[in-house]
Structure formats: C-alpha cells, structure tokens
C-alpha cells in the first residue's frame, strides 16, 4: 500500500487486493483529507473485498450500512443510524465482531435496561444489533448470531399508556419548584410535548420570545462522559412549536436568571439522569402516580386531544411525528371520545336548525 500527498495537498492511496475470484486487482483512490483517512479507507476496502470478518464492529457496521443504504427508505435508514450510533457503537464499536459473544450482548442489554427506556424501545434497539449479526451470518459466514443465544429484551407491543392530568402535573410541579432547572424544564416538557433529548439540546437562540416559539432541530445525550448533539431522527422532527403566553413569560423569567448566557448556550445544562432523579423526588413528595419522563409527552398529547379536541394532523406536527399514522396508532384510545363529541356537536347543530 502506498499513500502519497498530491498537488492539492490531499492524500492519495494505491494498493493491490484480491477480489472474490482470487484475482489480483489494483485500486487507486484520491483526495483524502488526511493520511490516516486514506489508510483506513484502503484497509476497509480490502476487508470488504475479501469477506474476512477479522475487523472491528464499527468497520463491519460501515459495510452493512453501505449495503442497506441501497435497499432501505431514507427514513428507515436514518432511524437505524440513530440507534446504532448512539446505543450500539459506543459499547461494541472497538470490539472485533468475531469476539462478541452472547455474554457480551447480555451485559449490554443489562446496561440498556437500567436506563428506564420503554419496553418497545428496548426491543427496537435489540433488534438493530440482531439485524447486523444476522447480516454477518448470512453473507459473511459468521458461525452464529450471539443475539439469538442471548435472547431478546423488551416487548413488541406497548404497555398501557400512562400520563398525568393537568391537576396531577401541577401537584408534581409544586414539589420541584425549589430547583429552577427542574421547575422550568418540566414546565417546558409538559406544555410543548418535546422529547427530553430535545429539551436538553435547546439553546437560547431556539427560544423566540417575540414570536412565542421554540425551535426544535437537535437532540442531546450524554454518552460515555461526552456531550453528543445529533439531528432529529426524522425530518419532521425539525419543527417550530408555538408557546402559550404563560410559558413564554415563565421562560423569559428563567432566562433572566442565567447569567452571561450566550445565544448558542444550552438552556438546561444538565442530563436526562438529573430529570429522572427529580421525577422520582417529585412523585414521592406529591403522591401522584409514577410515570416515565417520556410519558410527560403523552400527557401533553392527551391534553391536546381530550381537552382541546385538536385534529391528528396538528398533533402530529406539534409532536414531530413523521407520519400521521404514528399519531393515530399511538393515541387511538383517545380519539373515540373525540368522535363521540363530534357527533354530539352535529346533533346540536341539527336541533338548532330545526328550531329555526
């Protein structure tokens, strides 16, 4: 393998490899930004051509990703990227794929289950890892899939949804108001329906007090001690949420307390773990039923549908659902009541017409 700098100041790599027929072939690739990038690309290419699994998991993921990129819809691929890059690569990325055993998968599963994810989300994440190993067994002769031996986690069907009424939320909020980050954070979650990662990624410039809006265009997670900011899983996740006057004034009050904050600075400089701890504290002090942080999002949806009678397409836009079917399937149990209310209103309209 030869790696040289070209006249543009970029790096070229040239090497020989054996293709799937065992024939020696020459390859020349140009214009890498660094020598390291050129070398790594060549090494991956050689591995791909030889179908040799003596590689790190993250290298095989790139092979799998390149193949699936030709076969999956963009939204499906984006969701896959999101899960693998945030939930799988930090744990398995540097491990040799042939050395990952069922016991390793179970340890990873145990770590996931500690984080309070929903049962359906746990199943979804586990399925993504299993799919990569299935691909390796089918096309690259990996002897067996360690995920099959480890068993699955989570559930394919969601459990009964839990959410707070407005009265329950206000009781809870009263018990965490001693900490500004908790008070204003939970207030924003409840009255916007945003996800916890979206809340944590909000910056000062995302809050427009004059227009009374919040801009959602990114998500925050703390992974292996690092702050990780990623775009939403889907394009619909990028949205502008309109705010009630009450919340605008509350957020203005909160911002006024953040000394020296710059436009690009995060509004809530903490983590999901902090809010999870505060939820436990608040529910114990208030006596309201225990729900997950994500269920506050469901509480907002319930408010929109049951109290305000908002149509599914508007709910989908506000929550950032890619498809209206997601909204309808998630909250189908709330819409029958709305259908009955609609019929009652039609009856009133008919009766008023007859009286005239």
Locate the predicted segments by residue.
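N-terminal DNA-binding module of tyrosine recombinases/phage integrases
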Residues: 6-12, 16-103, 256-257, 263
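Active-site/catalytic core of tyrosine-dependent DNA strand-transfer enzymes
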Residues: 167, 219-222, 244-289
């Amino acid at each position: 393998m030869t790696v040289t700098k070209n006249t543009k100041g970029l790096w070229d790599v040239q090497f020989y490899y054996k293709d799937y027929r065992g024939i020696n072939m020459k390859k020349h690739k140009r214009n890498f930004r660094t020598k390291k990038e050129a070398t790594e690309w060549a090494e991956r290419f050689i591995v791909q051509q030889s179908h040799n699994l003596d590689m790190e998991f993250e290298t095989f993921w790139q092979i799998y990703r390149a193949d699936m990129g030709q076969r999956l819809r963009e939204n499906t691929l984006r969701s896959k990227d999101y899960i693998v890059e945030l939930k799988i690569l930090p744990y398995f990325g540097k491990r040799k794929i042939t050395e990952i055993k069922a016991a390793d998968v179970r340890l990873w599963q145990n770590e996931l289950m500690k984080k309070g994810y929903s049962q359906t989300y746990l199943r979804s994440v586990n399925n993504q890892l299993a799919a990569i190993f299935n691909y390796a067994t089918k096309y690259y002769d990996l002897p067996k899939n360690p995920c099959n031996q480890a068993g699955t986690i989570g559930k394919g069907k969601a459990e009964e949804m839990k959410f707070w009424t407005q009265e329950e939320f206000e009781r809870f909020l009263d018990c965490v108001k001693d900490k500004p980050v908790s008070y204003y954070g939970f207030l924003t979650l409840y009255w916007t329906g945003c996800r916890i990662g979206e809340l944590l990624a909000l910056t000062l410039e995302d809050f427009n007090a004059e227009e009374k809006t919040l801009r959602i265009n990114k998500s925050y997670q703390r992974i292996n001690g690092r702050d990780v900011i990623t775009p939403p899983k889907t394009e619909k996740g990028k949205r502008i949420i309109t705010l009630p006057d009450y919340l605008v004034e509350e957020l203005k009050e909160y911002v006024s307390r953040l000394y020296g904050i710059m436009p690009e600075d995060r509004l809530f400089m903490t983590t999901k773990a902090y809010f999870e701890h505060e939820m436990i504290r608040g529910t114990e002090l208030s006596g309201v039923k225990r729900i997950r942080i994500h269920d506050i999002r469901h509480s907002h949806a319930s408010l929109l549908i049951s109290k305000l009678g908002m149509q599914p397409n508007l709910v989908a836009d506000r929550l950032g659902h890619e498809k209206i079917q997601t909204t309808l399937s998630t909250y189908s149990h709330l819409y029958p009541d709305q259908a009955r209310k609609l019929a009652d209103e039609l009856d009133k309209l008919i009766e008023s017409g007859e009286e005239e």
